[in-house]
């Protein structure tokens, strides 16, 4: 019985993400937190170099970045693994212990390397 409960509980938890991809430039989609993480085709340029990340406006971006031009920096920081197992864009080592992250919380941005998404509000 205890084994069965452990198995059921483990499937309900969000699984930790894979490791950071190699240095390079990638195109990710925006996952909108206020719409349950749905993507709407809005692209972001993701530049990774030695644990540092820079997000830039893609030329294929929608109206999300009103007033921003293609190539403008949206956000940058250090990649850190949050205590929950997800990767965050952080500028403070203490961010890994924050209760609220990502989306519309005002906390660090969540990046999902497996789904190739950036969670934003």
Question: PLM features: residue spans?
Answer:
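Residue-level signal for functionally critical sites in structured catalytic/ligand-binding pockets
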Residues: 3, 107, 119-121
């Amino acid at each position: 019985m205890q084994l069965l409960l452990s198995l059921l509980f483990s499937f309900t938890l969000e699984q930790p993400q894979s490791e950071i991809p190699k240095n390079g430039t990638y195109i990710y989609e925006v996952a909108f937190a206020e719409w349950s993480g749905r993507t709407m085709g809005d692209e972001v340029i993701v530049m990774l170099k030695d644990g540092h990340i820079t997000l830039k406006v893609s030329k294929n971006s929608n109206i999300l970045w009103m007033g921003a031009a293609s190539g403008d920096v949206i956000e940058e920081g250090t990649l850190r693994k949050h205590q929950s197992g997800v990767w965050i864009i952080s500028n403070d080592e203490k961010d890994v212990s924050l209760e609220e992250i990502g989306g519309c919380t005002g906390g660090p941005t969540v990046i999902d390397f497996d789904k190739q998404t950036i969670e934003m509000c």
